[in-house]
Structure formats: C-alpha cells, structure tokens
UniProtKB/Swiss-Prot annotation:
Main location: membrane
GO CC terms, sorted: plasma membrane
Cellular compartments annotated: Cell membrane
Membrane topology, record value: Multi-pass membrane protein
Keywords: Antibiotic resistance, Cell membrane, Cell shape, Cell wall biogenesis/degradation, Hydrolase, Membrane, Peptidoglycan synthesis, Transmembrane, Transmembrane helix
Function: Catalyzes the dephosphorylation of undecaprenyl diphosphate (UPP). Confers resistance to bacitracin.
Coiled coil: none
UniProt-recorded name of the protein: Undecaprenyl-diphosphatase
C-alpha cells in the first residue's frame, strides 16, 4: 500500500535529517535501518533514494545560512562581500579532492563496501578517532577560531578528509569535522565549514546518482516520485532542527559523546553480523 510506503519514507527522512549533520553517518544509518525496514521498491531505486533524499537536508542549510552565504545580500559592506566570496572559494577548493578521487571511485566502493561489516568497522574507527582528538584538544587551544582566518591550504586538506567518507559508515560531516579539528580549527569553525562544504558536495553527489539512475534505463513512477518528495521534505524539516542543535551543542560541548555512540553502534552491528552469518 502506498500509505505504508509513505510512512516508511517519513521515517527514512527523519533518519536522514538527524544523521546527515551529526557525525554518525547518514548513509550507514539508512543502510542499517533498511536491514529491518525496507521500501517495497527495486534495488536501483533504493540506492538512488538513499542519496537523493539528501537534497532536503541541503536546502535546510541553504535556508539557515542564506544571508551569510549570499554575496549579494543587501546591507553587506564591501569587506563582507569580499569575505563571502573568499568563503565560497575555500569551499570550491575543498571540493577538488572529491572531484578527483571520490567521484571516479564511487561505483567501486559502492559495490564492495555497502554492507554491514565495513559500516561497523568505520563507525568504530572514527569513533575512536573522535575520542582521541578531543583528549588531545583538551590540552591545547585551536589555532583557527574564526572561519575568515582559515587558509585556502587548510580548506583543501579538509576536502581531503571529506574523501574518506566514500566508505559508508564514515560520515561526511564526521570526516570533515574531524579533519578540520586535526588541522587546528575550533569545533564551531569545523561545524560551520562542514555545513557550507555540504552544499556543492551533496548537490553534486545527489545529481550524479539521479543522472546515473536514468542513464541506466530506469524511470520513476508516480508512487516513487511521491516517496522521494515526502522523504526529502521530512529530511528538510528535521535538518532545520538538527543543524540548530549541533551549532548550539558545539559551543559548549565536545564530540566525545558521538565517538562513544559510534563505538557502541559499530560493536552491536559486528555482533549482529556475526550471529546473522552463523545462524
């Protein structure tokens, strides 16, 4: 029944809206949830669905940060306009590693890593990394506490960390936040740049997935269009709340709790995978 499929779409949209911005892996969570709750659709649609519903999350970022990211915003001084263009240049530079590395390798990683065990391992490894980096940061102050002070070189290397998210379970936001902190930025700067970098990255990735879906000879029926729209709209609404939560959270707390969550979830997935294999 279509109503059941739409309820599932709402559920998946909630998962996407929460996990896209928290450093816990949205794709990993969607793959995990779909182990137990699946859309009654073909494999090609589900693979495309898992990526394209990110568009709702991206639009949420654009809405929240529209004035800050718009160089043509009325009332901005010449200096503010210049800084906005410089921010966009940093974002473009940070996209280069993904264009050169992640895009060509995407299909290979999708074929070999989109199942439970690699997701579990990635969750645990990056969970440990978050705990380690926060312990290190407790003993030193960040070198970059404002986004305008971030260098183009730092932006490029943050983009290199983003490439790591090609492995499901890594988390795009997790990889970029972790990389930014390792490179000396504050948590606030790391989170902000992660949000901004998501706009071209996720638009591009979602667009490529959609184009590939149609070039492979697939098409969307009315029910599938409705499922995509409902899931994307849900992801948009939930993302508005998740982004507000994370921006407020990082002002007073570190990412240790997310590291612990990743380790616990990854461990449970490994146990589940073991029993599923044995029995």
């Amino acid at each position: 029944m279509l109503i059941i499929e739409l309820l599932k779409a709402i559920f998946f949209g909630i998962i996407e809206g929460i996990t896209e911005w928290l450093p816990v892996s949205s794709t990993g969570h969607l793959i995990l949830v779909q182990e137990f709750i699946r859309l009654n659709q073909d494999k090609a649609f589900i693979e495309m669905f898992n990526i394209v519903i990110q568009l709702g999350a991206i639009i949420a970022v654009m809405l929240i940060y529209f004035e800050r990211l718009n160089p043509f915003q009325p009332g901005k001084t010449a200096r503010e306009v210049q800084l906005t263009w410089q921010l966009w240049l940093k974002v473009v530079i940070a996209c280069i590693p993904s264009i050169l590395i992640a895009v060509p390798l995407d299909n290979w990683f999708e074929a070999h890593f989109y199942f439970m065990v690699p997701i579990a391992i990635a969750l645990i490894v990056y969970g440990i990394a978050f705990i380690w980096i926060e312990k290190r940061n407790a003993q030193q102050e960040p070198a970059v506490t404002e986004l305008v002070r971030m260098s183009y070189k730092t932006a490029f290397f943050i983009g290199c960390f983003q490439v790591l998210s090609i492995v499901p379970g890594t988390s795009r936001s997790g990889a970029t936040i972790l990389g930014a902190i390792i490179l000396g930025t504050s948590r606030t700067v790391a989170a902000d740049f992660t949000f901004f970098l998501a706009i071209p990255t996720m638009f591009g990735y979602s667009g490529l997935k959609a184009v590939k879906f149609f070039l492979d000879g697939h098409h969307l029926d009315f029910a599938q269009v409705l499922i995509l729209l409902v899931a994307s709209l849900t992801a948009f609404v939930v993302s508005l709340l998740a982004i507000r939560f994370l921006t407020d959270y990082v002002k007073k707390h570190d990412f240790t709790i997310f590291g612990k969550y990743r380790i616990v979830l990854g461990s449970l997935l490994l146990i589940y995978s073991f029993f599923k294999f044995v029995f």
